[in-house]
Swiss-Prot record:
The lineage of its organism: Bacteria, Bacillati, Bacillota, Bacilli, Bacillales. Its EC number is 1.1.1.42. Belongs to the isocitrate and isopropylmalate dehydrogenases family. Disulfide bonds: none annotated. This is Isocitrate dehydrogenase [NADP]. InterPro entries: IsoCit/isopropylmalate_DH_CS, Isocitrate_DH_NADP_dimer_prok, IsoPropMal-DH-like_dom. Mg(2+) binds at D310. It comes from Staphylococcus aureus (strain MSSA476). Keywords: Glyoxylate bypass, Magnesium, Manganese, Metal-binding, NADP, Oxidoreductase, Tricarboxylic acid cycle. NCBIfam families: PRK07006.1, prok_nadp_idh. D-threo-isocitrate binds at S103, N105, R109, R119, R143.
Amino acid sequence: MTAEKITQGTEGLNVPNEPIIPFIIGDGIGPDIWKAASRVIDAAVEKAYNGEKRIEWKEVLAGQKAFDTTGEWLPQETLDTIKEYLIAVKGPLTTPIGGGIRSLNVALRQELDLFTCLRPVRWFKGVPSPVKRPQDVDMVIFRENTEDIYAGIEFKEGTTEVKKVIDFLQNEMGATNIRFPETSGIGIKPVSKEGTERLVRAAIQYAIDNNRKSVTLVHKGNIMKFTEGSFKQWGYDLALSEFGDQVFTWQQYDEIVEKEGRDAANAAQEKAEKEGKIIIKDSIADIFLQQILTRPAEHDVVATMNLNGDYISDALAAQVGGIGIAPGANINYETGHAIFEATHGTAPKYAGLNKVNPSSVILSSVLMLEHLGWQEAADKITDSIEDTIASKVVTYDFARLMDGAEEVSTSAFADELIKNLK
């Protein structure tokens, strides 16, 4: 077998039997969790395909290790390698202190135009949870990754730049509601039609491909009408223009209510559901954050903007065990580029202690295997995690919250996962 690059074809990814996949080991606990995760991934691939498939891992540098080695936090060589090989896995990265790059994670997403942050959230039986029915949580979050207030267009209070911006807003645009202009910092919130459409398109296509029931557009369009309100409307418009015969939208529902009454609208939605159509609906963000606690089963795939998505994905993760078991991916569905990553931080006080839960980066690698079409290997890891947690052999974060648990190290947890691969 010869290791080869993954390429992007007209119908999606072309994945060889021995793909070369770059990885960033990460800072802090990164080496601990990556050593565990890579062993589990390799064992699952071997078990699933009897040696006919394997991954050749290629280390690239970012974060503290890159800075110590090259003097750069995010070397151009790393970006070029990921661009060339399309798919990568990464551990948590520290945020550089001082000027320049504000966040290495954001820089990677923007440089590679990874417009979707994919965050599936589900509960594994036995995982400690603060809610009564964590099993009702089964959502997939599509968070827009490149726009919104996280675009990084900010001007610090007191600078020449912010004074120019405020002067322009007040004197050219007639903005009178900057309450304290002399001491305000300013951030810009870009939300585009193109950015919205490619995110919502990916979310709806995912729902169709994975037999999901609905896509909820989460927004604050009631307040921010020309950014978040436009996101909602562009999302609905895209759903009908590109997926018209496969979806039923709440805007269609409202039109039927107006013309024929609510009974007719309810009947139309029930008919659409029976036909397997995806229901496209929307929710104001603050109401949505209540509903994921009070009735999470009503939501399935979620499409939302950058800031809302950040809050929602971590709030949901808390309901099913925390970010230690929350997978994540950053994907450009058009170019094929994707980075699969641990969703937690570097936890430097635990670095090198062989103590923390490696499940986030392992489950993110499950997303990668699914993305490659290697479903058999992905399922083996997921099933093993379910069985291992159910047997109460867990790392310290779960052991302290479970009766009768056996606390094990990071590496021993990986050993247990490998043992339980079926």
